[in-house]
Amino acid sequence: MKTPELDARPRVLSIPAQHPFVDATWPPTAEPIRPAQLPVGERWHPHPGLEADWIRAHAGEFDIVHVHFGFEHRSLAQIRDFTRACAEARAALVVTVHDLVNPHRRDQRAHRDRLRALTAAAAAVFTLTSGAAAELAADYGVAAEVIAHPPIVPAAQAAQIMTASGRRGRSAAVFLKDLRTNVVTDPAFYLSLASGLHRSGAWLEVWAHLSSADHPTVTALQAAADSGAAPGLDLHLTARLPDAVLYRALSGCAVSVLPYAHGTHSGWLEMCRDLGLSVIAPDCGHYAGQADAPEAVRTYRTGSGAAAAEAAVWAIRRGLIPRGDVAGRAAAAQQAYADAYAHAMTPMSAGAAVAAPAMFLTEDEC
């Protein structure tokens, strides 16, 4: 690791390297280190830097390794080896905990073990809400600094889209996409949600990718819509929408319902708020803690379509809730990361980070 006297600009290996959150929070004082063999196109994982052998082979090329997410494919043994390799390379480890509960897994034991090993070896830990920070302190013994999630949609673009869309009617949007593991798959949830909306003069717009057309949840909703059994339901099957098209589709709705059975935080929630939608979120995780304004995020009992409908109807009647003051979020996160990198690069902090042992647990593989 370089010392501040030699070069004050830290060289940072970010995992992932390419992601809207990483881009928005990147400190201008940091030099990005991007491996030649990064995933191509729209894929941002897997990152080769999670391989301990890669870290050892490229030791001396970076000062900081900053892990956000995208490590669920690694075993606990591999994560331990990765943290040891970072220490051997004298690269300080920084971790931002986005997911206390992994949205791509049902059994969370292996994820918790991996997260414990990463945070135990980290010179600095961040997370996105005060509730998540409290959970990290209680369950992992980790003091995490809270940074608010930055906006997803550029402010000028969001304003233009919202102006063009006009007032947005009485529809609630649910985007199933490819039905990630944490998405509710019981059709009854969506049928109950649609029914509750319909009774109040509103309706449900469900969007799913064409690649999921044969998924049992999608086929059940399609059958209900086609037969007239769900008069408050409109189902749209599309290819993956370009961002601009997605933003316009969302902006035509009044609220967005997050159909999650488990999770922690949501970039989707932030995107919806950027576009002026109120968000109806399950009461699991820390989604409510992301609210940028009072009543901007309304919670419902996880898994209950009727409760989701009640919350959505309330939000539709409540009307537009302007986006809170989020303009400074990206700059604040950039400064927090810059400070953490600078502190980690001081000789005393660097030595402490290298000496810090990873937490050794009974391995529970995925």
Which residue ranges define each predicted feature?
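Extended catalytic core of nucleotide-activated donor transferases of GT-like folds
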Residues: 45-121
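Acidic donor-binding loop of glycosyltransferase active sites
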Residues: 248-264, 274-277
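Donor nucleotide-sugar binding/catalytic pocket of nucleotide-sugar-dependent glycosyltransferases
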Residues: 123-137, 141-159, 167
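Conserved catalytic-core segment of nucleotide-activated headgroup transferases in glycan assembly
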Residues: 164-226
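Short Ser/Thr-rich beta->loop micro-motif in glycosyltransferases that lines
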Residues: 176, 238, 257-264, 282-283
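Short hydrophobic beta-strand element within catalytic cores of glycosyltransferases
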Residues: 278-284, 288
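A charged, aromatic-enriched C-terminal amphipathic alpha-helix characteristic of glycosyltransferases
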Residues: 303-362
